[in-house]
């Protein structure tokens, strides 16, 4: 699926199509700030790690934590679990995570309990903060993410001093998508902390793997005509000069490890809030290190 064109390699190809459906529900859109806790799960520890995370999420929800998050597992790439939280501002993130843990003893106790177990299941963690770039996004997440089951995540590294070329290429791509009315959507987040400067995350929600299969048809002649020969030439130039690397992986949403917002859970309650039996767990998770979010 990879193509030399910057647009296709970095945006189009990496975001497979999602056809709008009548069941799509109104959604307030992507958060302005996201926090991602990335955990690399040890080989053979996936089941016990999930049990620990499930108990953590349920206990936080029962304690009325002000923080929310979506948990997801990698299906490609490294064996990772991601926990993505959304906020209006950095101050909002501080209030709902650090301040909440420091001022509500029950939340602190829960966090301490479950975070202490992570060392047995996880080999490394990383906390990443990124801000939403509406100017680079196509349709954003105008459809409630709670209706989806997978997330295509493309991580783009841009050469220092070449951010303007990345922006130009992405806008060329978006314009072509708009002209061709391509039935997909993506949200671009610029990393501000936790990864090298010039890192961008492109999120594309998928309802099923059939969305990936549909990519060639979705980006067929109508789309190629919208890009045009001049556009393809320019994109190839931008790809060569602007990008260090682009990597795409697919994550599966894991409702058991999630503490979703009411808005997300309401999109599909049977999926996001199934009846849980009490999970016997050993442990704890990384409190302030583990967020909660959208």
Model-identified regions with their sequence ranges:
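Positively charged n-region of N-terminal signal peptides that target proteins for export
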Residues: 1-4, 21
């Amino acid at each position: 699926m990879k193509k030399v064109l910057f647009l296709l390699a970095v945006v189009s190809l990496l975001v497979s199509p999602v056809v709008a459906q009548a069941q799509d529900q109104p959604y307030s859109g992507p958060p302005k700030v996201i926090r991602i806790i990335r955990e690399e799960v040890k080989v053979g520890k996936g089941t016990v790690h999930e049990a620990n995370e499930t108990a953590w999420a349920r206990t936080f929800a029962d304690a009325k934590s002000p923080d929310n998050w979506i948990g997801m597992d990698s299906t490609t790439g490294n064996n990772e679990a991601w926990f993505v939280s959304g906020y209006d501002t950095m101050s909002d993130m501080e209030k709902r995570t650090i301040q909440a843990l420091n001022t509500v003893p029950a939340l602190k106790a829960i966090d301490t309990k479950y975070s202490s177990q992570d060392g047995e299941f996880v080999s490394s963690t990383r906390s990443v903060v990124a801000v939403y770039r509406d100017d680079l996004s196509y349709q954003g997440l105008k459809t409630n993410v709670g209706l989806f089951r997978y997330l295509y995540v493309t991580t783009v590294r841009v050469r220092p001093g070449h951010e303007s070329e990345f922006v130009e290429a992405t806008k060329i791509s978006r314009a072509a998508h708009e002209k061709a009315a391509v039935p997909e959507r993506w949200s671009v987040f610029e990393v501000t902390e936790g990864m090298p400067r010039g890192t961008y995350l492109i999120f594309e929600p998928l309802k099923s793997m059939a969305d990936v299969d549909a990519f060639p048809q979705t980006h067929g002649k109508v789309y190629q005509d919208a890009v045009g020969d001049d556009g393809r030439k320019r994109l190839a130039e931008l790809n060569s000069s602007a990008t260090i690397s682009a990597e795409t992986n697919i994550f599966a949403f894991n409702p058991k490890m999630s503490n979703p917002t009411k808005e997300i859970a309401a999109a599909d309650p049977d999926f996001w809030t199934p009846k849980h039996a009490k999970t016997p767990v050993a442990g704890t998770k990384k409190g302030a290190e583990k967020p909660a979010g959208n």
